């Protein structure tokens, strides 16, 4: 029985959880538009970092919703263990700075064991091949018998070792997934309060009269209906009416046209996707407090962001260098359970189960990701400045980055009805992590394979 | 134990099934944009046609997915049994014309039984009240003992009869739901081929070059990606790219602005709703071959049309007459499993699991529904004429109406890439069929001259509203029409004039050089 060929896969074990309820209260309302945190996965995954073969098949889906160690994953992350081993001090410091609970020692140990076991397996295979070769020639019956016996023993040992190897690789992947992305050198080290202000635009408007919050305005101007939606659908759903409908369409139309001018390709996406895609993007559709709605009777889920179906377009692909960069502005409805989000930061339109969003997504060469990160944040700042908003752009500190982000800029706008700033967008540079997840590669002119980084921006 | 107060409810036992695979093949591709057909429900429902009280509570949700007769429904339709009984010949003819499998005899029989049982129950209650009254006075001990005994017996009989009554009402509702709406006298009787042409606009464009279908155009112009979507989501999903995104937004923007001019209120809606709302609108979320996606671990579903959440806005309400008519143009994404739809009519954008749609919905007084039906179809015809489409409006024959529709106009547009007409919109007058299930009523502003029974003291009795729905724009089907009809020999596609301002002035979708 040969080693199962498995699709390169991955799941950075992250969940959509609101940063809000994990952080101490400040004057800034962090809405956790799309935060990811690490959580050890209980499902073992197999890593295929050493196989040169690109063609793989899916492991039969035996994933169950309970965390059984025996459950085989559908796919694996192409994690660069050699690099981790060779840079272990930096990786350790990074893990600490990010408050991650990744266990680097365990990873390195398992990796060593795995490498050794792999060598042993290969050695046994070679011996068995030799035996098979010898048996092709003319032999004495006793010699033949001896070889048959030897072949059988080798085969039995191999089967055992190969099973062990599979388990070891699963375990290694399981532990290794917790390891967060490396961090940009300019990112401030520390918690939320250490985040640096990259820019502040405008100032809070001075009102000469008592002001209303958006809920009151929505009622008074007959723009938003939460009450009917609570009957029809449940809490955190709403209807938009009258000018609010036109406003939503205007926002999306205008945003699309502005961003298209910068060379982004407009896109609409499926809002139902296979759950494996959701996982590859780093979310746990079936975990407790999952943010993801699943469809009954299928392996499908609703997307929480267009990032998921857009990332999926190019999965398991090799792109030509000349095709890069790929720049998309993707529009979709987004669905989130908001499980676990409670308290004041759920009022009205702040936290809803369904909303429209335009998302920018960039696939580029590694050396370009930093400049695209700057391009994305610049586009956002320009958009919000044009709309006359008062906002600040934050360079998020290490403990506030999600696992995939190499660097993250959040924009928080002033919301007078609430008397605080609230997050309206973020821009993440995912560097190579998502590239691992979706197995994107770029073939350089020189023919060397390198993983591409991704830059993401939400609007 | 009193009669359980139950919420006005119902579920017409219908499913979203495509008319296509139920009808013989003709030169018209009936895409069954939104058809409903009858199917007996296995779950009994309780009817509340006789209770004057409007305030009710939900029956605890004990619905299970297997059809157990003991399962209590969450709500009931306010079906007018007296009217059915008094007009039974007309109802029977209607059932036959519509090829419905409703069993009128069974309904009438159950109704009789129910009425009689109800009388018996009321009689026993009155007796028990009398006994209780007598016991308030001064009595001989033996007399008191006798009355106590009598009271006990009456109570036991009542409990039994009341349980029977509940079961009977459930059974009655279960059978009665199959009964379709009555039919407009002008509707042709018969199958699909009997549908009458109300109007035909334009003529098929003559092409001087070999034409492509929308799939080919979508590939060549880099507008539609089905392949990636098949990997990411499955078949019948797609990405729109480049000008197609602008085209979708232009279609919706333009449609919205045109319809708003006619006094329709724009609306966006939740796309996740409780399954009971879906049922009240006449769909079976949990039947075999259901068109409805359900959400795991909840009682929620994805909507297949904005008609559902819009109908839900005013459910269990009494509107003022002065508030009517309510006219909405609602925009939403729609999700359909398309279970059971197979064959040639599933190609490309014809039949997809997710699409954008603008839907018109009207709530009005009964006497106005006919004129609103005309208004809706006129709006649709004007929209499609403005876009330069060649289409015909059909007055659908009786066998082709869904259960809720009193009358239905379908518009089928010429799709040259397929060489046939394909349904792009549908306008239905559902009269009071949905409102009896959703519980939408209105209170007339003045008492009528001849005195029918009054509701609350000095207030005129409430009546059920009429509801209508009509597709203003189903984006994928429109895209098929526009791409295929407006293609040029050089592979480009012309944008119809009304849409250009909504697309930043683009006049042409040109092939891109790679």
From Swiss-Prot, chain B:
Pfam families: Seryl_tRNA_N (PF02403), tRNA-synt_2b (PF00587). It catalyses: tRNA(Ser) + L-serine + ATP = L-seryl-tRNA(Ser) + AMP + diphosphate + H(+); tRNA(Sec) + L-serine + ATP = L-seryl-tRNA(Sec) + AMP + diphosphate + H(+). Coiled coil: none annotated. CDD domains: SerRS_core. It is an enzyme of class 6 (ligase). GO terms for cellular component: chloroplast; cytosol; mitochondrion. ATP binds at residues 336-338, 352, 423-426. GO terms for molecular function: ATP binding; serine-tRNA ligase activity. PROSITE patterns: AA_TRNA_LIGASE_II, UBIQUITIN_2. It is found in: Plastid, Chloroplast; Mitochondrion. Disruption phenotype: Lethal. In heterozygous plants, aborted ovules. L-serine binds at residues 305-307, 359, 471. Its EC number is 6.1.1.11. Keywords: Aminoacyl-tRNA synthetase, ATP-binding, Chloroplast, Ligase, Mitochondrion, Nucleotide-binding, Plastid, Protein biosynthesis, Transit peptide. Its main location: plastid. Pathway: Aminoacyl-tRNA biosynthesis; selenocysteinyl-tRNA(Sec) biosynthesis; L-seryl-tRNA(Sec) from L-serine and tRNA(Sec): step 1/1. The keyword Ligase applies. It comes from the Eukaryota. SUPFAM superfamilies: Class II aaRS and biotin synthetases (SSF55681), tRNA-binding arm (SSF46589). Homodimer. The tRNA molecule binds across the dimer. Belongs to the class-II aminoacyl-tRNA synthetase family. Catalyzes the attachment of serine to tRNA(Ser). Is also able to aminoacylate tRNA(Sec) with serine, to form the misacylated tRNA L-seryl-tRNA(Sec), which will be further converted into selenocysteinyl-tRNA(Sec). Consists of two distinct domains, a catalytic core and a N-terminal extension that is involved in tRNA binding. NCBIfam families: serS. This is Serine--tRNA ligase, chloroplastic/mitochondrial.
């Amino acid at each position: 029985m040969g080693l199962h060929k498995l699709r390169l896969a991955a799941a950075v074990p992250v969940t959509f959880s609101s940063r809000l309820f994990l952080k101490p209260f400040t004057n800034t309302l962090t809405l956790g538009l799309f935060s990811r945190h690490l959580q050890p996965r209980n499902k073992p995954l197999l890593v295929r970092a050493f196989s040169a073969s690109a063609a793989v098949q899916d492991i039969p889906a035996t994933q169950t919703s309970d965390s059984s160690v025996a459950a085989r994953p559908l796919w694996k992350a192409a994690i660069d263990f050699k690099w981790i081993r060779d840079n272990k001090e930096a990786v350790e410091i990074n893990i600490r700075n990010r408050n991650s609970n990744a266990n680097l020692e365990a990873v390195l140990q398992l990796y060593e064991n795995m490498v050794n076991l792999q060598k042993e397996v290969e050695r046994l295979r070679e011996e068995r091949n030799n035996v098979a070769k010898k048996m092709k020639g003319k032999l004495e019956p006793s010699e033949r018998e001896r070889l048959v016996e030897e072949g059988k023993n080798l085969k039995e040992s191999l089967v055992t070792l190969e099973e062990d190897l599979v388990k070891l690789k699963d375990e290694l992947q399981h532990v290794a997934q917790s390891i967060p992305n490396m961090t940009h050198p300019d990112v401030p080290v520390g918690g939320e309060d250490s985040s640096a202000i990259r820019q502040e635009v405008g100032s809070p408007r001075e009102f000469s009269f008592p002001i209303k919050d958006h809920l009151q305005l929505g009622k008074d101007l007959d723009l938003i209906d939460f009450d009917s939606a609570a009957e029809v659908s449940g809490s955190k759903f709403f209807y938009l009416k009258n000018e609010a409908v036109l406003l939503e369409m205007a926002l999306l139309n205008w945003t699309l046209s502005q961003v298209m001018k910068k060379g982004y390709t407009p896109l609409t996406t499926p809002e139902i996707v296979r759950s494996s895609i959701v996982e590859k993007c780093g979310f746990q559709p079936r975990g407790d407090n999952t943010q993801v709605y699943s469809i009954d009777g299928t392996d499908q889920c609703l997307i929480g962001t267009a990032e998921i179906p857009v990332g999926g377009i190019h999965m398991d692909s090799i792109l030509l260098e000349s095709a890069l960069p790929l720049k998309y502005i993707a529009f979709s409805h987004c669905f989130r359970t908001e499980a676990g989000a409670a308290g004041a930061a759920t009022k009205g339109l702040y936290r809803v189960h369904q909303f429209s969003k335009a998302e920018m997504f960039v696939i580029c060469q590694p050396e370009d990701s930093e400049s695209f990160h700057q391009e994305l944040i610049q586009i956002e700042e320009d958009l919000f400045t044009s709309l006359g908003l008062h906002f600040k752009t934050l360079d998020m500190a290490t403990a506030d980055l999600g696992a995939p982000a190499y660097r993250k800029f959040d924009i928080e706008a002033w919301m007078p009805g609430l008397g605080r700033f609230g997050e309206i967008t973020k821009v993440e540079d995912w560097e190579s992590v998502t590239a691992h997840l979706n197995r994107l590669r770029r073939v350089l002119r020189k023919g060397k394979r390198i993983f591409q980084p991704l830059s993401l921006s939400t609007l």
